[in-house]
């Protein structure tokens, strides 16, 4: 049977950023050839959770989610949702990009994670 988005409690069709103290939850959609946001800004030391939902309906169209500076890399299949939590301990601009060839414009599927240094 084909997975349905409602089968995952964190599945989303809307993009959002929620902050609760130093915990940041990013709900992010992926639909070829773009992520649902261009950038996310957090503070150094924040605990960041990305919840990524692939909204594509094509059975073999997975999307990668890679933040190489944080050693994060996984693939989210169609109508699947996966998440990752990490501490934003490296100030600077970190590229998030799709590592699974998904579309003719695959190389455009990227966004920025901006980690603001403490005291700046």
Each language-model region and where it sits:
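Acidic, Ser/Thr
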Residues: 53-57
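N-terminal edge beta-strand
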Residues: 13-47
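Conserved "cap/hinge" positions at secondary-structure junctions
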Residues: 50-52, 86
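Conserved aromatic beta-strand anchor motif in extracellular beta-sandwich/beta-rich domains
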Residues: 67-69
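Residues that flank catalytic or metal-binding motifs in active/ligand-binding sites
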Residues: 46, 61, 109
